[in-house]
Amino acid sequence: DSYNEIAKETSVGDLNSSKISLHTVGSIDDNEFEKIYNETKNSVFKDSTLEKAIINKKLSCAQCLKLMSLYTFDNDKLKMLQVLKDHIADTTNYDNIVNSLDFISSKNKAKEILGIP
């Protein structure tokens, strides 16, 4: 159970394949994330699929950004952020999520969702 785990070592990725790890201390590992990502990507109802898949799990901001990138438009990304907000392990990286959005109004909405003043 990710909530109760002692902080894990941050993965630096497989240098041979130049795959960058999206894992951070306290978040699910890359393999588990890829499973959730693919399930969500292949689902017609992405938000509800994701909501079920991340029960009792924490994600890194990088993992959240990858999931949000399944959508093109900020409004859809913000809906996904609403699902993800209580599952973010590295809250110090919220700015990465906010800055990924295209419009100032979307950035402000993301701050509101994340509880950033």
Place the predicted regions along the sequence by residue.
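General marker for long, soluble alpha-helical cores
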Residues: 1-117
